[in-house]
Swiss-Prot record:
It is found in: Mitochondrion matrix; Nucleus; Cytoplasm. It catalyses: uridine in 5S rRNA = pseudouridine in 5S rRNA; a uridine in tRNA = a pseudouridine in tRNA; a uridine in mRNA = a pseudouridine in mRNA. It comes from Mus musculus (Mouse). This is Pseudouridylate synthase RPUSD4, mitochondrial. Pfam families: PseudoU_synth_2 (PF00849). Residues 1-46 form a transit peptide.
């Protein structure tokens, strides 16, 4: 069969650009004309031309922001979407590159941003989906699936523990439940917490938010209230859960801070609620808990927006700056010493520290010779 662009006397070529699945677009006739005037256009050369033109068109359609921060945000969003849409084998390979520690009992990874741990409505791919594939990549085709030992929120990055055996996973889960695992999170906050160090001990419960955007949020359920300047104990809500968070400001600027958080308890969204509603310092990029009455992009001061190089209309693209920085596991299984695991910050988190003028603390202090310290790659 002759190539479609070869001209035949008395035959008029018709454009099919308006039809779905078209072979030619209006711009493709130019190279067909020039090509046929010099030498025949065979099927291979035609395919190469069409492929090059398609790539060129796709490059033109991608709008690259001129602002560096907007470019980083766009890259983050695109990378997150790709992680949820890739083939499970590709995601498992990405997680294998993020392994922080591996032994006969455990595999510890540096969880990426925007990746759910469990499936649910609207979730195309999650970490639990690819654990069987990851296990086979690490231990061969006969390997049993890895098991989750705990969970992190979709937007939270950092240390995440997996176990080879179900029994070991239950043992680690019991350590978390009985508060024998020491956890440290880092967060960038909007405004600076006062005092600079302390303990937030306020119960938390889930509550329905009335209004045009009816939804549910976790909120504070205080055991005390102020009455004429005195603290008066109130009846505890049956739905409230004890929630305790230790915090310390590591670095601060005029309108933001780097805060280290140690959750004593493990209630849903505990750190976000205690910072936002307990200390009035929401986490940067927390578009859910920055305002109680509605779900809307976080409102930032003009000074903060200027430092980030963003306009308020682009604030919705700012990711949640909450990172599971460090985990200390007691001796367990084949290990005779505790294991200290430290994860480096995501690129977007480190860049925000730089832009906001927040200093990185010195290298975390080790816990002595009995602790085995592992630093994330």
């Amino acid at each position: 069969m002759a190539a479609p662009c070869l001209r035949t006397p008395g035959v008029q070529l018709l454009s099919m650009s308006s039809r779905p699945g078209r072979l030619f677009t209006p711009g493709s006739w130019s190279f067909c004309s020039s090509a046929t005037s010099s030498r025949p256009l065979n099927a291979q050369r035609l395919a190469e031309k069409l492929r090059a033109q398609k790539q060129e068109q796709k490059a033109k359609e991608v709008r690259v922001p001129t602002n560096p921060v907007q470019r980083r945000v766009q890259e983050l969003v695109r990378f997150t979407q790709q992680l949820q849409r890739v083939h499970p084998n590709v995601l498992a390979k990405e997680l294998s590159r993020r392994i922080l520690h591996q032994d006969n009992d455990l595999v510890v990874i540096n969880k990426p941003y925007g990746l759910p741990v469990h499936g649910g409505p609207g979730v195309q791919l999650c970490i639990s989906d690819v654990l069987p594939i990851l296990a086979k990549m690490l231990h061969g085709h006969k390997a049993e699936p890895l098991h989750l030992c705990h969970r992190l929120d979709k937007e939270t990055t950092g240390v995440m523990v997996l176990a080879w055996e179900k029994d070991m996973a239950h043992q680690v889960q019991e350590l978390f439940r009985t508060r024998q695992v020491e956890k440290k999170y880092w967060a960038i906050t909007v405004r600076v917490p006062l005092p600079s160090a302390g303990v937030v001990d306020i119960p938390i419960k889930e509550k329905e938010v009335q209004g045009p955007q009816q939804h549910h949020k976790m909120t504070l359920s205080p055991s005390y209230r102020l009455d004429n300047g005195k603290m008066v104990k109130v009846r505890a809500s049956r739905d409230a859960h004890v929630a305790v968070t230790q915090y310390q400001v590591l670095s601060s600027a005029s309108s933001s801070a780097l805060v280290e958080l140690q959750p004593v308890t493990g209630i849903k969204h505990q750190l976000r609620v205690h910072l936002s509603f307990g200390l009035d310092c929401p986490i940067l990029g927390d578009h859910k808990y920055s305002d109680w009455t509605r779900l809307a992009p976080q409102k930032l001061s003009a000074g903060t927006l200027k430092k980030l190089g963003l306009q308020q209309s682009k604030a919705r693209y700012i990711p949640l700056h909450l990172h599971a920085r460090q985990l200390i596991l007691p001796a367990l299984g084949s290990r005779t010493e505790e294991l200290l695991l430290t994860c480096k910050l995501p690129h977007f988190f480190a860049r925000s520290l730089l832009r906001l003028g927040l200093d990185m603390p010195n290298q975390d202090q080790s816990r002595g010779n009995k602790a085995r310290h592992v630093e994330a790659r």
